[in-house]
């Protein structure tokens, strides 16, 4: 007897659901796309428990004829294509007829629908792929579909779902992309009784960007437009000063469909050229319209990847369009905004706090400000960040000589020093900071004074005693030992010194946090807010306290004392970018990345000319480092040429036919 047999429809649908429905966000995507294809202008999404127990999508679209409803839950039944020619001319978001039967196979589904052509609608109930009931129903035109108990008959799938906040952020992210694409549709999203997203449906894409990413970010967007014989491009791109740590903030829409395509996103980055910092990516929304014959959507179960004909031509059009648009714009950052914009935001926050109470207990801090704590705080002095009260004074620096006493001061509340190196720049910023004074190793009389270093007093085994010689091009230092010559990258060297200092500071979980009298606000999208809420323990472990301030804004209440003054917002943005990009970061990994980031930010740069004393101090600190050989990113700090190797380079040692001979034996 043969062993091959045809699978039942129920089992086949459950298998298909494994490809189409990965998580609650997949259900929301399929149902909302059906509503869009039905011509809806208003779509409301309601979820509970991140969609695991309840999802409801309500639209005012065309509805489904009652006769067609049972067929709609049959595999490969669709109204969107009829023959193979339609498969190459797809203009709808859905076309396979897999979504509804896949959802019904693994959940309890109830659908109520009505069209304008029928006097009554239909209320249809199906669970686990089996029809429960079909009864007449009255109501307005459109469709209401409710999904309960997702994966109830495939419990193994539930084990692979992430935390509720993570799953909810994925749902919101999908709706964000659809809202950016279909700006003429009014979307609302609510979860567990709280509103997460609301768009007006007025067709203004920049207004949707403001609703998702914040008004400040939307104001830093540039409109773009370009076309050739095959493609038409419109949309918005961010100014080079507005970047993120991943490509996730770049939305590419092809004929209204959100897609992921490396060649297209890479073309956007190429359009910026050298205007972007390494490892940073622009924000933006790119609308690409083309003949459906030039794209193949039927290559991915979730239809998130497509094949593009004439991809090279499209990429070049994107590069040219973006490059030309940036060339038209004055890209010099607004100095007033840079110096005073954040303080204005802080003042606005302070004024607003009197009338606004955050309504998001899902990100409540452990030591929330109740009435008792507020009263207690009001009677105690609060440390205020110097950056909020002390103006930056730019003064001309005196010419430094190597025989003067150089005193460097940098204050830290933990009273541990961090090395600071004088440069020969024309000006330097003098700001009042929290602590430590130490003298250079060369005093006025030339005597060797005692230094206090933030590193171990023991030199690493094998690290030579270096005698500083000079500097080249403000980037490299020359030094020598008894038998070798060394070339040192000054930026990498100070990165290593700073890294070991910050690693120690960040690794200490203490009460040395800076509580802000006037909190700093940062705009995030709703999906980012949800993801950040999921990682509050990691943030709190570093001494960073964030609280919600509305649907798309976070307040920095406290931050570690090692934050650089004036860079608090940028630092917090980078730290939250790590969490959003990497997802699963342990506290130890988080601290490691923070130490690396701060070490790079505080390191001297190329083309900065060090005084002899400062260079010697840098080498002294490097010699005390636990690992003086590599910067935190793995790049080499120094390279060595032995005396023998140098003699070979200059032919002072040559190989004869019989033996090595030295020019020292034959003086010129």
Curated annotation (Swiss-Prot):
Coiled coil start-end: none
UniProt-listed InterPro entries: DNA_mismatch_repair_CS, DNA_mismatch_repair_MutL, DNA_mismatch_S5_2-like, HATPase_C_sf, MutL/Mlh/PMS, MutL/Mlh/Pms-like, MutL_C, MutL_C_dimsub
Presence of keyword DNA damage: yes
Residue stretches of biased makeup (Polar residues): 438-459
First and last residue of the signal peptide: none
Pfam families on file: DNA_mis_repair, HATPase_c_3, MutL_C
MF-aspect GO terms: ATP binding; ATP hydrolysis activity; ATP-dependent DNA damage sensor activity; mismatched DNA binding
Domain of life: Bacteria
Annotated protein name in UniProt: DNA mismatch repair protein MutL
Native species: Leuconostoc citreum (strain KM20)
Gene that encodes it: mutL
